[in-house]
A protein has these predicted regions:
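P-loop NTPase motor domains
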Residues: 4-290, 306, 333, 354-375, ...
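Conserved ATP-driven motor cores of ASCE-family P-loop NTPases powering translocation/secretion/packaging/pilus
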Residues: 282-284, 288-370
Length: 387
């Protein structure tokens, strides 16, 4: 199947038209083209309500991860790790454990020293391996949380030895620190995991997985993920699922070169989610029949979430840049510079910051295939073909 795969980044303040003009329209188009999708929806559930019937009528395999109402499918990020371990896929197992541990650990705010984040990540890797190597019946975020408490109360509880080689290698390095330092590392890891498991309903829907994530690359699938965007406690859950899904899709490409069914990620509030090595994934996405549409509020938001160098790489990997209404100075400056200059003497931008400030609702500055323009977008509910 030939398809025009391009990555897109969309900027704009809340209510400027990012969802109605881009996210929902691209979802509708992808469904009509037979592409698989991931879409995250906010508390308004606008994307889900606007596209579910179309997805159903097109015969899609529909997966619903509902962290708003706690209905639909369940997802345990460690189920695939366990499968890899039991299948003796040590390389894939190790890679996914590393990705999950990194996705869980956001850098400690206010600290420029990476020691705590690195140490906490190492500890989480170690206790995941410990659960695997001791053949624990329960392997989940909840089990990790319990193990953090038990091992911090009495390190000898773990009983590390020859039967736990990977866990011993990782955890002994943590436990050789001073008692105070070790306690702080364990506290950081526990706080990281427990910040996700904030109620009994989340614990319940993260104990098992109700679908086979490895079948997603082979079936026409749409994944709806609903979550309350106003609460950062759910950012970790979204990050974990996206991290694992991207891992699965890319390793499916390792066998075939590219996906037979193109896959489209439409990720709203992208800057809130910590996706390890994302800049590497997006730089090679198009050749694998994978595309990303990333919706953010401003350049500042992206740089805070991913650092300036990574944010620049992500922007450079997006062939389409669309900027709706915003008052963010850095975003206005960046977009004005992207528009190019009218002459080589005065360096007058083709689109000034003042022009960008005058954008109306649903109107956006666009850089499509390196060509700047200002376009008026049509929201999904004004489409003639909208059901």
């Amino acid at each position: 199947m030939k398809t025009d795969i391009k990555n897109t980044i969309v900027l704009g303040e809340p209510g400027s038209g990012k969802t109605s003009c881009i996210a929902i329209n691209e979802t509708i188009d992808a469904l009509k083209q037979g592409h698989s999708l991931f879409v995250n929806d906010n508390s308004k559930e606008e994307i889900y309500k606007s596209t579910y019937d179309l997805a159903k009528s097109q015969g899609y395999n529909i997966i619903l991860l509902d962290y708003l109402n706690y209905k639909g499918d369940s997802f345990n990020c460690l189920d695939l790790v366990k499968d890899y371990y039991q299948e003796n896929e040590s390389v894939l197992c190790g890679e996914l454990i590393s990705l999950i541990s990194e996705a869980l650990n956001k850098p400690v705010k206010g600290s420029e020293d990476p020691f705590w984040t690195i140490s906490s990540t190492t500890y989480i890797k170690g206790i995941i391996y410990y659960l695997l190597e001791t053949k624990s019946k329960k392997i989940s975020l909840e089990a990790l949380s319990h193990l953090c408490v038990e091992s911090s109360a009495r390190i000898e509880f773990l009983g590390l030895g020859r039967s736990t080689p990977m866990a011993s290698s990782l955890l002994n390095g943590v436990f050789t620190n001073s008692e105070k330092t070790t306690a702080s590392i364990l506290m950081t890891a526990f706080a990281t995991i427990s910040s996700i498991l904030t109620n009994s309903k989340i614990k319940r829907i993260t104990r098992t997985t109700s679908f086979d994530i490895r079948k997603i690359p082979k079936e026409k699938t749409i994944i709806y993920l609903k979550y309350p965007e106003y609460s950062e406690q759910y950012d970790g859950l979204v990050s974990l699922f996206l991290t694992e899904l991207i891992h699965v899709l890319y390793h499916s490409c390792d066998q075939t070169g590219q996906l037979d069914i193109p896959f489209h990620f439409i990720i709203d509030e992208f800057a809130h989610f910590r996706l390890p090595s994302f800049e590497r994934y997006i730089s090679t996405a198009r050749s694998r029949n994978i595309q990303f549409t990333l919706l953010i509020q401003s350049m500042d938001q992206l740089e805070i979430g991913y650092s300036k160098p990574v944010a620049k790489t992500i922007m450079d990997c997006c062939q389409n840049i669309i900027s709706f209404q915003t008052t963010n100075y850095n975003t206005l400056t960046y977009m004005s510079q992207l528009s190019g200059y009218r002459d080589t003497v005065g360096h007058l931008p083709r689109v000034s910051m003042n022009d960008l400030l005058k954008l109306r609702p649903f109107e956006a500055f666009c850089l499509i295939n390196h060509q700047p323009s200002i376009q008026l977008f049509k929201p999904y509910f004004m489409r003639r073909d909208y059901l």
